[in-house]
């Protein structure tokens, strides 16, 4: 198997994408944060002391997508053309499902940006609620779709 992020000396390198065609690309990632039912209720009611948890988490997720290349060493800086973060409150399972959709037109995909957006949104929820619930669990973060580029469409069965 040819490792694309390793040079001839066996050292890390950023892949050269300059010869790749620019294409419209999209990535969708999801994840969940489980919490006590009381915590979920308070988020829903807007009574968390630190403020509007989902509004802050949404902005944090978007900012994270835009700054992925600053956190993940081999990620290329990408001009993101769109980023949307959505939340679904699941009272039956006492969790919040998070979804990030990231778009660009470029030479490399935005999978890492979508995954980073979901992760940071979940971490932000944790941060804003940890005073009342330290048992929260962030899990099930995964890429569910990517399109564009040479490899085309990928969709995970969920």
From Swiss-Prot:
Catalytic activity: (8S)-3',8-cyclo-7,8-dihydroguanosine 5'-triphosphate = cyclic pyranopterin phosphate + diphosphate
Descriptive protein name: Cyclic pyranopterin monophosphate synthase
Oligomeric and partner information: Homohexamer; trimer of dimers.
Listed EC numbers: 4.6.1.17
Active site, per annotation: 127
Binding site residues for substrate: 74-76, 112-113
Role description: Catalyzes the conversion of (8S)-3',8-cyclo-7,8-dihydroguanosine 5'-triphosphate to cyclic pyranopterin monophosphate (cPMP).
Highest rank taxon of the organism: Bacteria
Enzyme class name: lyase
Involved pathway(s): Cofactor biosynthesis; molybdopterin biosynthesis
Organism per entry: Thermoanaerobacter sp. (strain X514)
GO molecular function, one term: cyclic pyranopterin monophosphate synthase activity
GO terms (BP aspect): Mo-molybdopterin cofactor biosynthetic process
Pfam families, per database record: MoaC
Presence of keyword ATP-binding: no
Family from the record: Belongs to the MoaC family.
This protein's UniProt keywords: Lyase, Molybdenum cofactor biosynthesis
InterPro entries: MoaC, MoaC_bact/euk, MoaC_sf, MoCo_biosynth_MoaA/MoaC, Mopterin_CF_biosynth-C_dom
